[in-house]
Amino acid sequence: MRILLSNDDGVHSPGLVALYEGLKGLGELKVVAPDRDHSGASNALTLNRPLTVEQHPNGFRSVDGTPTDCVHLAVNGLFDTAFDRVVSGINTHANLGDDIIYSGTVAAATEGRHLGLPAIAVSLVNNGHFHYDTAARVVRLLLEYKQALKLGPRSILNVNVPDLPWERLSGFRVTRLGHRERAEGAVPMTCPRGKQRYWIGAAGQGGDAGPGTDFHAVREGYVSITPVHIDMTRHEALSGLREWVDGMDESTGGQP
């Protein structure tokens, strides 16, 4: 099994190193990750300049681009043989609910899916202890058993692991994405030259965080596993919207 590892925290992230160490012996591992932190980059793809790839003494490769760039280059240009899996992480913080829209960690997995590969995005629900070894062990277990899991080649699993020793985990839960409340306001500041600057405000708390959600699972000490797909169509709105458009056509005689 050939596994591509990437992330959004950068090629020197301790989470990425822990993931690599934890998956040794499971297959052929290749690491292609951003040369710096790209948290919150989402699915950004660099189209306005060429990208540079550098190989480090430990064999890891870095790209001066986004997580999506890294997976795209790795699958479509850097290596002669194909990959079987993409694993993105271990992210330093949780990717729960609406976080996945912004997450570069999930975006790297998403790019794998776009290129026809099953993918896992794994994040540590960090409380300051940094039990990356626990998260790496979770990923190894999932990869070992994923052969029997019939999700298809374009599947994505979003995995969030409580920041606990392995023996203190409550178990595993299959969950749906919860939802956060509105984000906190932007934080203004004045730079030394007197110009106004702003920091993006903190993410909102889990508003939809009850039983069955990823928020609830990790709060109870469970590993949260959420199957994610890319279709953003709001299917339940299609019928009503068609009726509205049909009525609009009738009132305008079919003219815009």
From Swiss-Prot:
Catalytic activity: a ribonucleoside 5'-phosphate + H2O = a ribonucleoside + phosphate
Family annotation (InterPro entries): SurE, SurE-like_Pase/nucleotidase, SurE-like_sf
Disulfide bridge positions per record: none
Keyword vocabulary terms for this entry: Cytoplasm, Hydrolase, Metal-binding, Nucleotide-binding
Known EC number: 3.1.3.5
Subcellular location: Cytoplasm
GO cellular component entries: cytoplasm
Pfam families the record matches: SurE (PF01975)
Chain's role: Nucleotidase that shows phosphatase activity on nucleoside 5'-monophosphates.
Protein name: 5'-nucleotidase SurE
Gene that encodes the chain: surE
